Amino acid sequence: MKNWIFIFMISMITLPGYGKVKVQKPKMKHPTAFAILVDEVTYEKIPGAIEAYRDAIEKDGLSAYIVSGNWESPDQVRKEIVALSRRKPVLEGIVLVGDIPVAMIRNAQHLTTAFKMDEEAFPFIESSVPSDRFYDDLHLTFDFIRRDSVHPDYFYYKLREDSPQQLQPALYSGRIKYPEAKGEDKYKAIAEYLYKVVREKQETNELDCFTSFTGNAYNSECLLAWMDERLALEENFPLAWKNSRTAKFLNFRMADYMKFHLFDELQRDELDVMLFHEHGAPDQQYICEGPAPVGMNGYVKGIKAAIYNEVRKEVRKGKGTPEEIQDYFIQEYDLEKHFFDDLYHPELLKADSIANANTGIVLEDLKQMNTYPRFVMFDACYNGSFHLPGYVAGYYIFNDGKTIVAQGNSRNVLQDRWTIEMIGLLSQGIRVGQWNRLIATLEGHIIGDPTFRFSVAVPHTLALDIVKNPADRQLWEKYSRSAIPDVQSLAWRMLADQDERHELSPRLLKLFRESPCNSVRMEALKLLSRYANDDFVEAIRLGLYDAYELIRRNAAAYAGKCGDPRLIGDVVRVWLNTPESERVNDVLQSALYLFPVEKVTEELKTLQKSATTVTPFALRQRQIGEMIGKLTDKKQNRWLDYAEIPKATLSLKKQISMIRYIRNLSLIHI
């Protein structure tokens, strides 16, 4: 009885906070801690759900704080997180529940994978990045700019020039924010979601069932890129390969309107993980383009529909009157006036509307559906735009299904990013938030409970070692010999993080040469990029010929970033001889611009005369000739301009503009 009274009293103690902030100490003692940060109104409305969530987290092995307040700025929230991070036990993660201020980050586009927008030319709300790295990457420093006058929960910050310029979050984080466009009582919805999390934490559920889907126009629609994902996921999710329903790979080509097949997948109770590789918007997942044309009439109708859609789109944008837009297309494509007779025919508009609706998953679809994959990854632009009233990822967790957590992006994201890096750690019981921390980007966020994890048959201490023993070299050397590929990858990452003397690269090159595991070789290549030495150059050269398409693609990107002339011959030959690897070829073509023009041109001319290429002679001649023309044309090869940066003839403004462009450039972000 005395012990119960003591625990109750401890749970009611509040620590000094900022303003009206209240900090409830954990009820249970564990080696690491977690913080639930919630706005005052949400906590007052649903205290039972918040506390039940706290209790479930503590039963799952984390001491959990509840921090509630009338949050007036992100700085106020961050101050509380910093204070908790200095306490014991060590804080490993946080979750932001309800209406927590949104930090809109500027001067940091080099930390994004793809988002590049002129911050001087475009409005703040468009050219800033909504990012919770403000809350979990505490070594970054910012200057406050201002609060948004229309959206009072948006606060603009500039990454300081003297701040660290790389992401290294010490904590993991998640957002539990109801998408108010859904139209229900948000406090009731948050409470129901939290009780769903509590129920799911009571289940024993190993990761043994997943589906991966690739949409149209993703990765240049390269079939090799799609096929080779299996090489990695066989290593990542070893328990899933039981039958045809537990490990699925779907592609937009498999049906005229794949969204309906995906609806079936999303409502499978046994599905643990759903991976979406697609293009996206805040309110839509782009799945396919509809049925392919059949016969001559089909192609004619397809062309007509495409032109009609473009005309209507231009009119909606206010680019001109319908007549003006039609006149432009008539002249551009040599059309007859009567071509547009049916442009606004009611039946045609209705048919087009239905067809367009069937090509993507929209919020209205999700509003009527319960989703069941416990974890959903949106490898897509904008699906994780938590700062908006309606966003795709939010609709996936706020329903009566069993989806607990999603990963999504608040801005656009690079297709070539290694999105499934170390995802196999989820099979080993690592928390979803911890995995996301290891692959952090400025725009990538966890939507939902970041403490969620799958069960493991044999308990181990890996999750605890990540937090408590990151610098124990002997321990990570032991893990590097694990039979589990992504545990090996994590171990080598930890060893590289401690390699202050830069002595590890020969071992990493040996690992890259000898490992039979695709994921491990890819991690070795990525880690070697830190060293930028001869070992790295050799790994790039070997990587251009690797069996795993993703390694070839990233080796191509690294070749351009590295720019070592020794790679020119291999880059040119692979570019010319492997047209079937469409995405690799795209990256290689971009990389060619980053080498000395005269040396690339010389190599191309040598191959032009050679018979040792697989492409037909005439095609090879034309392809090489066009490439030489692009490389030597200043209008097409802007890198010829950037060679002028050190010269005093350029104005300071021009130099700064060029430097900013190069800093922000992501030929590829891995």
Q: How should each PLM-predicted stretch be described?
A:
Residues 8-18:
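Hydrophobic h-region of N-terminal signal peptides that target proteins for export
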Residues 483-484, 516-517, 547-548, 579-581, ...:
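Short inter-helical turns and helix N-cap capping residues of alpha-solenoid HEAT/ARM repeat scaffolds
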Residues 669-670:
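Conserved small/polar residues in nucleotide/adenosyl-binding loops
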Residues 464-465, 488-500, 519-531, 552-564, ...:
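Structural detector for internal amphipathic alpha-helices that build alpha-solenoid repeat scaffolds
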